[in-house]
Amino acid sequence: MKLWGGRFQKTTDSLVEDFHSSISFDQRLYKQDIRGSIAHATMLGKVGIISLEEAAQIVTGLKQILEEIEAGKVEFDVAAEDIHMNVEQLLTAKIGAVGKKLHTARSRNDQVAVDIRMYLKDEIIEIRALLKELVETLLNLAEQHTNTVMPGYTHMQRAQPITFAHHLMAYSQMFMRDMGRLTDCYKRTDVMPLGSGALAGTTFPLDREYTAELLGFAAVSDNSLDAVSDRDFAVEFCAAASLIMMHLSRFCEEIILWATGEFAFIDLDDAYSTGSSIMPQKKNPDVAELIRGKTGRVYGDLMGLLTMLKGLPMAYNKDMQEDKEALFDAMDTVKGCLMVFRPMLATMTVRQENMAKAARGGFTNATDVADYLAKKGVPFREAHEVVGKAVFYCLQQNKALEELTLEEYKELSPVFEDDIYAAIGVEYCVAARKVRGGPAPEAVQQAITRTKERLKQLGE
């Protein structure tokens, strides 16, 4: 008989049982569910709603069930619907009628809310740790490449010379913000809903603060309707996860391009590449491509949650059972991508000579020629026009800007002197950009130092 079956005269249709059941995916909440039940039973005993002896029996039974689940001795029952009913059913079978007192002053509505929040808190901690490891890898790589010149791009066209370290540090800032977003999400998840009941609280004299203390929550919810009916914390996590994936996907897109023969900026390690079933020469960046592809999957999880929630009246609705698969999938996907991306990045070979060669082509020093004129008093817009003509002339003559003679420069503007050549070497162009946040080696090293300090603070 169903634990809620007293009002019903017929058994549930088997098709409905399968359709209705969530145990296939919410069984991963078993630790949190049992932990929440142990805290609830302990609190019930403390305030005298059940006897201390009954509370002890329940706690002992729950701990035994936890051990049995982890030993693989438990086969969950689809007919019991979900992890909550499965655990309660197992408990009653183990300790008898006392087990039926566990659900006193509790609904599955506040029970599932506390389970998800506890689970998400643990996942956020794990994902933040993975992001921290990734940022540390980026910092280590950046320190090795503060003098590795490469082209910076806009519109996928070579724009200005930078360093590989500067490029890596851009991603370090993105992933640091991702860590910050997860920290904020954790704060809003760290609110205990248990004690809210189905929607209207309870008539029992619960000590919610004590339960929150037992479960490690920083705060207790202030409105029972809100506590059981919203999943904005899950949406917030999926939004943060989507941004992590977006940053990973952008980086992977560049890695895929850099690994092509046309760019040849990097070589991926064999351990993070695959071959072709027909073309013997192929070395494919499948890991990066899969991460790029899985990004859309996490976006879908976010959209699914938002769409599921948008039309729900207060308070709990069965639609909300659909929150878990989207949330769990986003968690699993982000973790899996971070776990494989970091070592792929750490083991790739950087082809510095090809990066430097690319930086010297494409007139990446054109802006520096314009800056040269502006520093000598030529209005920048006039300088821009002069250099544009110089580039056009170089294209006609098949020359680089540094290959023009001083006479050719003076035909463009009498302001040019011999010192133009020292000002437009790509290494100088990079080194001259010492402004905070710029690509000069000393500026990048300062950024690395600041980021290490911020990373340390985030970890505290």
UniProtKB/Swiss-Prot annotation:
Keywords: Amino-acid biosynthesis, Arginine biosynthesis, Cytoplasm, Lyase. Disulfide bonds: none annotated. This is Argininosuccinate lyase. It is found in: Cytoplasm. PROSITE patterns: FUMARATE_LYASES. It comes from the Bacteria. Its EC number is 4.3.2.1. Pfam families: ASL_C2, Lyase_1. One of its GO terms (cellular component) is cytosol. It comes from Desulforamulus reducens (strain ATCC BAA-1160 / DSM 100696 / MI-1) (Desulfotomaculum reducens). Its main location: cytoplasm. Belongs to the lyase 1 family. Argininosuccinate lyase subfamily. It catalyses: 2-(N(omega)-L-arginino)succinate = fumarate + L-arginine. It is an enzyme of class 4 (lyase). Pathway: Amino-acid biosynthesis; L-arginine biosynthesis; L-arginine from L-ornithine and carbamoyl phosphate: step 3/3. The keyword Cytoplasm applies. GO terms for biological process: arginine biosynthetic process via ornithine; L-arginine biosynthetic process. InterPro entries: Arg_succ_lyase_C, Argininosuccinate_lyase, Fumarase/histidase_N, Fumarate_lyase_CS, Fumarate_lyase_fam, Fumarate_lyase_N, L-Aspartase-like. GO terms for molecular function: argininosuccinate lyase activity.
